[in-house]
Swiss-Prot record:
One of its GO terms (biological process) is tRNA modification. Residues 123-217 form the Rhodanese domain. Belongs to the TrhO family. This is tRNA uridine(34) hydroxylase. The active site is at C177 (cysteine persulfide intermediate). It catalyses: uridine(34) in tRNA + AH2 + O2 = 5-hydroxyuridine(34) in tRNA + A + H2O. NCBIfam families: PRK00142.1-4 (NF001136). It comes from the Bacteria. SUPFAM superfamilies: Rhodanese/Cell cycle control phosphatase. Keywords: Oxidoreductase, tRNA processing. Catalyzes oxygen-dependent 5-hydroxyuridine (ho5U) modification at position 34 in tRNAs.
Amino acid sequence: MSEFLTVAFYKFVELQDYAELKAPLLACCQDNDVQGTILLATEGINGAIAGLPHNIHTVLDFLCGDPRFADLAPKESWSEKRPFYRMKVRLKKEIIKMGVPDIDPTQTVGEYVKPEDWNQLLADPDVVVIDVRNDYEVAIGTFKGAINPNTKSFSELPEWLQEQAELQKKPKVAMFCTGGIRCEKSTALLRHEGFEDVFHLQGGILSYLEKVPEDESLWQGDCFVFDERVAVGHGLKPGRYQLCRACRTPISPEDMKSEHYVPGQSCPHCYGTKTEEQQQRFAERQRQIELAKQRNQVHIGAKYSRHQPG
């Protein structure tokens, strides 16, 4: 039975006092044995945390006690193991980094499309569908026919969008991402640039996988998530991927059969790209992880990801 509850949430809202929120929020999470990452900025909050259900609800109650977060809509999923090893509350310039000034999702965004209605939009020949996630995410799963921008980070997307003549040829643009936050900014950017018929998947891929039956789904593959689960599939069940600890790339069961796969040290995606010093460091880290497992302990040095949640 799944024991740990993971919740992902975000909200764009003006937080001039965001720095003052860090200490009490971190203390609340630590007091309730909750792990994960929460980002705070003047533009809002973005987080993913996990713990025992009653502890998670205590933290959410604490958050929603602030009127600015009263309508927070966390997305839930379950796991048998802790998906995070640490609790971090970080202060940022943006809760999801795009790097474009004057883009304010509280003022204008694309039209939300419910997961139940998303298939109909995808079938519209007048719609350009864009996966706004990064290349390593798209590589393990996406919607059929979606355009892959081949970006390494979300901050590369604005430049890519400016170069796309295809967007001028069709009257409608639809975007999707993991949980919705990147679409808030990317659709706001398109609206800012004068596009009128802009849509995005409400609640992101995670809501689609949760609400749309697998036999009706147009999703292909797994959805990368920013924690130790690495990926989830339909019904938000654990996917088939693990994470290469050397390069942070999702690796499939087929990748793990490669002669270039050494647990914690290399995979087919990064074999031969690391220095001898890095290889020695990775080998020692893996040794510590294995020792911790033998002692039935968690090696907190095994970070889940270098990326932001969202």
